[in-house]
Structures are given as structure tokens and as C-alpha cells.
Amino acid sequence: MTDDKDVLRDVWFGRIPTCFTLYQDEITEREAEPYYLLLPRVSYLTLVTDKVKKHFQKVMRQEDISEIWFEYEGTPLKWHYPIGLLFDLLASSSALPWNITVHFKSFPEKDLLHCPSKDVIEAHFMSCVKEADALKHKSQVINEMQKKDHKQLWMGLQNDRFDQFWAINRKLMEYPAEENGFRYIPFRIYQTTTERPFIQKLFRPVSTDGQLHTLGDLLKEVCPSAVAPEDGEKKNQVMIHGIEPMLETPLQWLSEHLSYPDNFLHISIIPQPTD
Amino acid sequence: MKAILYSQRNEGPVPRRPTGLCAVSVAEHRCGPAHPPRSRRGKERRNSSGEWQEEGVRGRWPPKAAPAAMPSSALWAVDLFGRVFTLSTAGQHWEPCRDAQLEFKRVSAARDCCWGIACDHQVYVLVGASDVPIRCQEEAYENQRWNPVGGFCETLLPSDRWPWSDVSGLQHRPLDGVALPSLHWEWESDWYVDENFGGEPTEKGGWTYAIDFPAAYTRDKKWNSCVRRRRWIRYRRYKSQDAWAKIPSEDDPQQLPDPFSDLSVGGWEVTDEPVGRLSVWAVTLQGKVWYRENVSHHNPEGSSWSLVDTPGEAVQISCGPHDLLWVTLWEGQALVREGINRNNPKGSSWSTVEPPTSENGILHVSTGVCVVWAVTKDRKVWFRRGVNSHNPCGTSWIEMFGEMMMVNVGLNDQVWGIGCVDRALYFRQGVTQSELSGKTWKVIVAGREGDRSLSGSSFSLHSAGCFFGNEVRGSAESCGPGDTDASWEVPGPASSPAGLRGKESWKGPSHATANFPEATDLSSLRLLPLGLEEPDSADCHALWAWVSGGGCAVEAHTTLKWFTTQSGLCPSVQTLSLSITPAQTAAWRKQIFQQLTERTKRELENFQHYEQAVEQSVWVKTGALQWWCDWKPHKWMDVHVALEQLTGHDGAQDSILFIYYVVHEEKKYIHVFLNEVTALVPVFSEAKHSFALYTPERTRQRWPVRLAAATEQDMSDWLTLLNLSCCESRRMHGRPSPQAIWSVTCKGDIFVSEPSPDLEGPERRLPCDQMFWRQIGGHLRVVEANSRGVVWGIGYDHTAWVYTGGYGGGCFQGLASSTSNVFTQWDVKFVHIYENQRWNPVTGYTSRGLPTDRYMWSDATGLQECTKASTKPPSLQWTWVSDWFVDFSVPGGTDPEGWQYASDFPASYHKYKTMKDFVRRRCWARKCKLVTTGPWLEVTSVALRDVSIIPESPGAHGSGLNIALWAISDKGDVLCRLGVSELNPEGFCWMHVGTDQPFTSVSIGTCYQVWAVARDGSAFYRSSVSPSRPNGDCWYHIPPPPKQRLKQVSVGHTSVFALDENGNLWYRQGVTPSHPQGDSWEHVSNNVRHVSVGPLDQVWVIADKVQGSHSLSRGTVCRRTGVQSLEPKGQGWDYGIGGGWDHLSIRASATRAPRSSSQKPASKQNGQPPSVAGGPWQTPGPVCC
């Protein structure tokens, strides 16, 4: 019998094989070899690409180096989205490895946030965790934690330490025994087809008559266009962590098991591949 | 020694049932001795088609569905129509009582039965259905005297006893004169001769000889044996289980009948002798109080009513679980019975308690262990303060909120009531030992099975209101539907608890209550116009007349589902059944597991050579603990600890624990590689949260590293982290394999070890002390496993538990615990202390001892002082759940006050005082309870003492077969479980296997050889047990080793080992397929506490007095070495983890080591049992057909 705990492990240890190539217009002293790396799905691009940066800086002149940024098929990659989300949203239908282009020039100010240091990633990550707990427990759990617990969450993510992270994170995943779940489910729904970055609304895990809400219920409520009509053809894929959970899956369970480390369910809605 | 077929041989003119159809020949099975088989006693018969059947046993074979046994803990209630319902503490629906024909006025429930007064004013008792029948042994003695002419004959001397008598010889007792006590009993079989004489088989015919009556009898006939006698036995069985059995009333034909009007059962905590004793009290319409004599488990109906004089006219009575008995009088006062104790459960005198106010007398009382609740005539509810055994009258009344028709106090002093206006059932929330009056009334809204159909025929609010209203409150002039609606909308039964409602609304609007006579002709109701009937049955709730919580155990950890109506099951709600867990098998979950696996494959399989983005790092957790230092004087010293975890790129983890200490101002440290740790054992003693850490070396020294944390949370965090690291470094995740070795420590902690393939290998065996044990949550005394993953456990309180397939629980939270399959578990045990006294000529026995004496309050040895105030529960996990009470059940018996006498301390104690006795002691006990979590679910209905699951060699049996499981109940009944399989490890029901005495231990071997040990210390072999005949055929008596009493037996593939009460381990010699009982016992070892023989005939024990380099340990896991086919007894011991271990099961470990080439195929030699380790299994095992 497979236990639900194994899902957490699988989610955490998800890796995307990636090939980084330097943008052709970048000026190099000698030819830049592509760089191959397994990226943790749950982490952030700028947190795990020190090696990439070092690799390409070796072939470049010091004065040509400014802030690094990444792009896939013309789309600048937002570092503040988890890697797995970026991949699912933009590249899940293409062949592996994932080809990412590395830029050091012409930072797309209107598309991307600057990421001068790891502290910025930490601040962003912790604010997501806090927001999620505000939705789940009115911030009670995160506020009761000590500073070192917050630090352990971050260090766990940064050092890819599953045990260290989950020793603390499990407290964020608990809920009172008399309730059937969290107060609200922290989720964000992303679509490539719209301008809006993502959809986020208040949504409870349990309906007023005591029934558990499912993924399907959520989509019908907040993003009806994503759900195929009863008899209609399936036009979209609903993807979390590279898989397509059934619409019958209880949302509370998804939130406990398929949330990213920032405690949000990042759901990608992408057009069904035609082939 | 030879095993004797334990059978009846008919001698003399004994009426005998035709036995042709049931005498399954033992010879057929090629295992019987030369004696003719006796007819199988009891209930088994073959039907006409020759199929084997079990008579009177609830389970069918093959079982089709689980029997709907009476829930072990349920609330009983009667609605206004006299229908009886039960509501299980685990359920959320009222179940109608079986016997729907009878309508009841009153019910009073106990754990296993319910008494009631039906509308015919007769008393009935319903004994809950159980897989174990209620059976009583009747005995008679046949006495004979020798005379020179005819030898032994029935002609006795005129001064002699009767030829047929009871055991004393004083009473004439012919076999055909022994009658069944009532219509509710049936005979199990005919009379037969008992051939077991104190554990020893007698000669033919069961005769025992003596010089004269009465005298000491012996098995052997001597030259001076002038008289002889033999014992005949016959069983009768209570046949009216799960049905209302009528109790005859004691009406004097001279007088007018005086029917019963109220009744109450209780008193089960006064004494448990005989087993299941109950006090049943009743009140008649004329106000008399009656007591039912001799009600007990084995005599559920009791024997007769006896009148108890009262100073007034009684109307209602309530008997608490302990010694409280209150009666309400017609005039409104209450009578309180004084002097109820174990020697006098009827009590001795009455005292009177005045009602709270003089204008409103008491209408109704209900008593618990130390509470009394009452309802006065104005429907107010009162709580009596200060009630206990010493002061049964209490001190004063306190008015409680709400107005009730009646209240009832159940187990644990929990309270239920019936609302005065809405007739709804209320539960008093928040009743605890410290707050006995509770907090609020909460309405129970559980639905009734088939509410719709019930209401369709006769449910009418108007009629109900009129019909049962006790008082005239309003006029019945307007009884239209609108009116009834109004009276129901306002109180709003489900919306607001009674406690919140104002008094005005309690009185209700024009509530249609008329003073109808208390007739019970329900048929007239059905003639009422249809318009009065409630149109929508879902909105109407039941109207209750009576409630009884005497069988309903609500405790702090019980979560009741009575207060919400839930439509449809939530998919993630954990259902308390192992066989069906919809959440586990849900398609969405499967899909996620499957897709994640596919994703990992897709994204990683071809890219393993890629570099990881995040370099693995060392992670260190530090903290401050205390360490029990290695040198003398041993003491706790403050240390700093650091756990360094290093993870390699392959995910392998390596961890080191450093312990830094300062000695003589010098900084030092010790370190432990976590991949060498063999066990982490929590130690909750000395009010310290500590744990012991074992390595192979520390195990050999019998001196673990002991560390203590400041708080429970801190200790739990460290223990969880270290456990995770140990499992991580050994790459162990998830649930234990089906082949795992399970064990239990003396603290009830459960440990499991994965057998490595070379564990039983012929060469290079893994030494026992290198086995890694990891803890599984829960608390057990016994755990037994089978290689198909079925694991059962038994708690200290004899509760049976079945393993759910989870892991973690207890102090293992988060990642160390599985998400599902972990449930609340509890256990109960007793702490004993001794009160010691010495006699002196002036004052008699006092607590003033000699200066050399032991403490006047001590432990059993007398060495430790243990007073009532200073004695703590066994560890911080346990809490007291009772007060101190005198324990009368100590070995050797006590006088009526619980004292045991002796000439001096320490000495052997006896129950009566003699001239030479200068000291005495008595045992006090106190109940404590532990609540924890673990991957275990309760197996309800029967409490167990021992359990054994068939060990299986892989592939030896069809895996589709049910798994044989045998058990001994706490009362000593032998049981076998039907329907146990991998998918349903709990099975369906028990099948009872008759015995002539209580049993203590049972074990089943791979080939269905069932051995058992009886209370008299002898062994029994059950013949012809097979998958198609799960309960076998008959018992063969096997005498114990000379002058020893056996206490445990374990059967592997061919080997049979037994353990006696003095710790000697015995091997049964000469067991062969054709002679499964063997020939004799051979001594193997001493100092053994427990033995477990596995499916490969491997022998593991828990041994005492194992010498280590640092200390001597009790309770050490040991493996027998050198066990070979030709030497099944083995040669020596290999010592493993310990001490403090209590129980071990090797019986799931069926992995054979890969056969080495040097191994000789030993089993080919002249039909010897096959080789144990690695040998080919060409010959079938013994008893295998």
C-alpha cells in the first residue's frame, strides 16, 4: 500500500532536466558550452542557478555581465514562480530537456522582478508562506512559530532538505480535528491564454452541507472556462507538479499533499496538446 | 509418556446419543492412538448430506457477512411507542432492537445485557449476542464400593453417600435428575466421564480411588482402595442470546398481582465474583422493592426475587455501577441504601434525603459512581453534591439548567436526559472526573434506521403528545396540525440546545397534552385521521420516553457523531473498518500515485547523468540533553548533543550523533554512527522524558546510551529525528514488510525488525545483536504476526487489536507517521500496593510494625515504600482513572476485608487468620489508563488472553485460503476466527471451541497443528484442524512434564515447544505426521520467559538473566542456534536486544536463506522432518495430508 506521505517525497524530489544555453547575442570571449542541470521543481530559478551563472561568466568579459535572467521560447521566466510551475505552464508539451536561454543583457524590466540577492527570494518565499497561513489558519500557526522555525523552512528549501523542511511544514498542514479542513485553500490558477497573471479567490475546502470540495468544484467556481462541458471535448489540461489530478480529487487533500513549499497550490491550465 | 485420547469410553448403562454421524474417525487422519474415538462432545453434528455443521454458532462457514453483534458500547432508549433502540458510540444512527414484537416501558442497560419492563409489566432480559456462548458445567459423581463378591459395585454401605452425588457426597444427584434451570437453556451434549484428574489422565473410565469416603482420591488403584468414584460432566448453554428472555415474577397466588413498574441494573463494580455479577433492583406498582438474586454472566436471568423492606412506597429506583442505590418515594423524598459492599451487595439499611424544595418532591433519580442526578416534580434538574461510597447521601442539591422528563447516569458518570417539552434526547457535555456536573446539554440528532417507514404508519405528533403526557398542562381542544406544528417549531429540537432556551419557551405554547390513560393499545393510534400525520418524516425527530446509558462508554477521547446529521460520506473521512477504506482505494488517489511515478520516470530516467542543482550539504541539529553517564557513580549529567546528517548525491544518508560532556573540567565527547544504532527505546520512568539508544556493542554490554530531554515535546522531537535518521541510513520507509519480526517491551512499546535474508542462514548468520528494531506506535502486551501481513495484538486490558498497515503514531508525528491508518489506541492496567500490619497483644493488628519490619505501605516485595499518596502511575503517559480500592483477587484468596495472613514478613500468605499469624497484608489497586495513537484498530466483542496466527511458508499454501487464527478469551474460552485474510485481517466472527476447563495459551503450526495449554498446566492437541474444518475435531490430552505446569506453547512447522511456569523450555519429542501428539517432553533450557517458533522451525525466546559486561538483563531477545532438521532442539543461544523485552513473534519470518552448496539434503534420511534452514522440502510436514 502506498502511503500519502510518499506523495510529499515524490513532489519534493521532482527534478526537471534542463539545458541552459547562452543567448546568441551575448558577447563572449570564447564559445559558451550549454550547461545541463537537474532543477528541483519546488525551488526558484535564481536560487539554484549559481552554477549556471558561474559557467557562463567564465566565457564573458567582466564588463558585459549584469543581472542574469532566463527566457524560454521568447518568454522571460519569472524567478518568483516555482520552477515546476514555469515548466508546466510553458514547456510541459515540449521535449526534454527543457531548453532555457540565459541572458545577461537587456533586463526586461516590465516582465521581471529584480533579484539582487537570495534575501529577496527568502522574503518572497516567506511572504507567500505567511499569506497561505493567513488563508488556512488566520495566520495562527505561522505566528506561533519561532524565528528559527521560519529559518528552518527557508534553509530546508534552499539546501533541498526534505526532512528539515517538513519537520516544520507539517505544522502548517494541520487543522483542528473538529474541522474538515483549512479555513480557505491557498491556491493560484495560471493560464497562458489570458493577460491576467493568475486567479486567486477565497475558496473553502468544505461546502456548507459538509461535502468536501473537489478540484472540479474549484475550477467550476473560479475558472469555468477551464472545465470542459459534460459532453464536450477536453480542451485544457489541469496540471500540478507535472501531473493531471482527477477533478474528483478533494481539494483539501491536494492542498495538504501537492502544495509547493510556499504552501500554495499552483495550478496550471494549459491547452490540450493537439497530437 | 503417552498421549491419551481425551475421550469418553462408555462403560455401564450410560444413555448415549447415536453418534454414528459425528464420530469422525481419528484413524481417517492417521493420527489417532489405538483407543476408539469418543463421540465429539457438544454442538458439532453432520447434516444429512454429510457436511459438517456447527450448531448454535452464529458464524456460518464460509462466512457470508459479519454478524451484527450488539455494539460493545451503546446507548439504549425507548421511544413513546415502546420501541427500543440502541445508538452505538461509534455510530450515528439508532438501530431498532431485534425483538420488535415487544413494547417496553423501561430499560436499564449494562455492558453485556439489558433489562427491561415490557408493556405487559413483565421483566425481560436481553443478553447481547456474542461469538462465545454462555455455557455452564453440570457435574455429578458416581460412587462405588468394593465388595469381595462383585468387585466394585453401586451397593454402598448404609452409612455411605449416595451412589450418585455431588462433589461433597451429601446431596443425591442422579444424572437424569439434573434439570435445566429455565426454558432459555439447552443441553450441549449428553453426560460423559471426565478423564482428566488434575492435569493427569486417569485410567480407563475415569475412576479415582480412595480408602474410604470422604478421603483423598488417587489415580491408581491400590490394594486398600475400597471405594472409587468418577466425575460425570455435561454442559448447558444459554440459548436466548440476542432475544428478550422473560423473567418469571414472584406473584403470590394468594394476593392480587403486583406488576413491576421500574427497574435498574448496576453494581458491577462492587465485586466481580462471580464473573459478570450484576445487581438488579425493581419496584412494583404497590411500591415494594425487589432484588434479583444471583445474576451473573453465567446466570444471566438470576435465580429468584427477594423482597427488600422499605420505609415508604417506592416509585422509582436507580442503582449505580458501584455501591450507590437511590429510590424515590411517592411522597417525594429519596431513600438511600447504606452498607452495600462486596459481601453484602443488597446493603443493610435506608436513610432518607429530603427533596431540594418542600413543594416539589423528587420525581426521578439516577446514580452513577459518585454522582446523583434528580428531577423534581416541576421538571427541574438537580445535581447532588458530595456523593461517594463513604457518604452515599451526599451533602446538598444544586439546581442545573434545563427541564427534563428524566435523566440517566451511565458509565463514567456521563449523563443523558429527555427534554421536557420536545422529548428529545440530550447528552450532558463536558462531564469529567473533575467537573462531574458537566457544562451544557447537547441534543442528540442521530437518525433512525427506517424513520420513513415507521412514521408512515403510526407516527403522529398529536397522538404522541396526548398519549404519554403525564400531566394536564393545556387543554386538548385544538389539536389541529397547525397547532402541533407550532409546538414543534418554537422549541426547535435540533437548532438550539436545551440549555440555551429560556424557561418560557420550555413551558411551550399551547402544547397539546392531555391526560390519557396509560394504555398501550397502539392500534387505536393508527385510526387517527391522516391529516394529523407529519407530512415530511425527515423533519420529525423521535420522541423518547426512556434512556439508559449503563452500557455506554463515553470517554475523553471518544468522538461522538451523534450531534450532526451527515448525508453521504466524505471521501477522506477515515472509516473505522480495515477491509473497506474508500479513501485508500479512491480512483483519484490511485491516479495521482500512478502519474507521479510516470512523471518521475519521464523526467529523470534518461537524465540521471545530469548534475544536481543543489549541492548536498551537512546539516547539524544541536541541543541540550542529559546523559546517564557510563561510569560510577551513575548520574544524569548535562550534555550538548549534535546530530550531523550528511546526504550523498545518491540520496544515501549518513548521520553521526555526538555527545559532548565535561568531566574534571575536561571537554570530552562520545559519538554514535546512526547506521549502527539497533534500537531507540523510549523510557518514561522517573518522571524524566528519556530514551535508550542501543548499538550491537551496547547490546552486548547490556548498557545502552541513555539520554533525557527537558520536556516531552523535546524528547519526542529528538526521538523522531533520530529514528528517521536511523531508518534513512538503512533505507527503510513505510510499513514493515509482511515478514517482519514483531516484539513488545515490558512497557508495552511495539518494535519491529526486518529479517535480513541471512538471518536464518546456515552460515554467516547475522548475529542477533545487529538486528535493527524500529518502533511502531501503540501500546500492546502481545503481538502475533503472519507472513501474509496479518498482525494482531492484545493490550494489557485484554482488548484485541488488528494492525492497519500504517506506521508511526505515538510520539512519532509528521513524516515518521503514515497519514491514514493511525487511530486512537488505549490501554488500562492496575497499579498495586500493599498495606502491611502487625499484631500486638494490646491493640490487635495495627500499622505499627517492628523496627525491622517492612514499610507499612509497600510494594509487593516490601522493599519499597509505596503510600497511596506517593504512588504515581507507571509513567507520565498514564493517568489515574479510579480511586484506590482493595483487590480481593490476589492469589491465595483473602478474608472478607481483603486481608491475607502470615506468621511473619516475608512469608506465604493465607486467607484465614490462625493463632500463629502475627502479620497481615492487603493489596490495594488503582486503575490507570493510557491513550495514544498507532496503526491499530480494536477488534470488538471478545477480550483476549492469547492469540496465534498460522505461520506460513511462502508458496506452501494457496494464498487464497483464509488465514487460520486461534485465540483464548480472557475467560479461558478457546476460539477460532473465521474469515481472516490479507484483505480482511480482522476476520468476521469467532467460532467457539468447547473445552472442559479454561485454557491459557494456544498455538497453531504451519500444517494446522493446534496445541493449547489449559489452566491446570497440561497441554492439549486439537485433531483434524484444516481449512475446511477450522475448528477441528477433538482434544487430545497431553500431560505436562513431570511436576511442572505448562503456561505457553508454540508450534512451528514440525517443532512443538512449550514453556512451564518455572521458566523451563521443553521440546516435544517424537512428533510425526502419523503421531502428531509426540511422545515426551525434553528439557531444552531454563530462564525462558516466552517462546516463539517460526515457520522454518526457528526458535526464538525472551530470556531472563542474560549476563552482559555491564549488567544483567531480564527480558532479552534470543535466537536458538544450531537448529537443524536432525537437531531441532538446537545447541545454544545467540543474544539480541534487551532487556525489558516481554514478547516476540518470529512467526511471520518465512524467508529462507539461499541454499548453500555445502548444505546436505538432510531431509531425505528416513522420513525425518525436513531440514530447517535451507534444506529442500521434499517430504511433507507432519500432519499434512
UniProtKB/Swiss-Prot annotation, chain A:
Keyword Nucleotide-binding in record: no
Chain segments annotated as transmembrane: none
Compartment(s) of residence: Cytoplasm; Preautophagosomal structure membrane
Cited Pfam families: ATG5_HBR, ATG5_UblA, ATG5_UblB
GO CC entries: Atg12-Atg5-Atg16 complex; autophagosome; axoneme; phagophore; phagophore assembly site membrane
GO biological process: aggrephagy; apoptotic process; autophagosome assembly; autophagy; cellular response to nitrogen starvation; immune system process; mitophagy; piecemeal microautophagy of the nucleus
Alphabetic keyword roster: Acetylation, Apoptosis, Autophagy, Cytoplasm, Immunity, Isopeptide bond, Membrane, Ubl conjugation
Record PTM N-acetylmethionine, positions in chain: 1
Domain of life: Eukaryota
Keyword Hydrolase tagged: no
Cross-link (Glycyl lysine isopeptide (Lys-Gly) (interchain with G-Cter in ATG12)): 130
Post-translational modification: Conjugated to ATG12; which is essential for autophagy, but is not required for association with isolation membrane. Acetylated by EP300.
Membrane topology field: Peripheral membrane protein
Protein family per UniProt: Belongs to the ATG5 family.
Chain's role: Involved in autophagic vesicle formation. Conjugation with ATG12, through a ubiquitin-like conjugating system involving ATG7 as an E1-like activating enzyme and ATG10 as an E2-like conjugating enzyme, is essential for its function. The ATG12-ATG5 conjugate acts as an E3-like enzyme which is required for lipidation of ATG8 family proteins and their association to the vesicle membranes. Involved in mitochondrial quality control after oxidative damage, and in subsequent cellular longevity. May play an important role in the apoptotic process, possibly within the modified cytoskeleton. Its expression is a relatively late event in the apoptotic process, occurring downstream of caspase activity. Plays a crucial role in IFN-gamma-induced autophagic cell death by interacting with FADD.
Assembly and binders: Forms a conjugate with ATG12. Part of the minor complex composed of 4 sets of ATG12-ATG5 and ATG16L1 (400 kDa); this complex interacts with ATG3 leading to disruption of ATG7 interaction and promotion of ATG8-like proteins lipidation. Forms an 800-kDa complex composed of ATG12-ATG5 and ATG16L2. The ATG12-ATG5 conjugate interacts with RAB33A; this interaction is bridged by ATG16L1 and promotes ATG12-ATG5-ATG16L1 complex recruitment to phagophores. Interacts with TECPR1; the interaction is direct and does not take place when ATG16L1 is associated with the ATG5-ATG12 conjugate.
Protein name: Autophagy protein 5
Organism: Bos taurus
Gene name per UniProt: ATG5
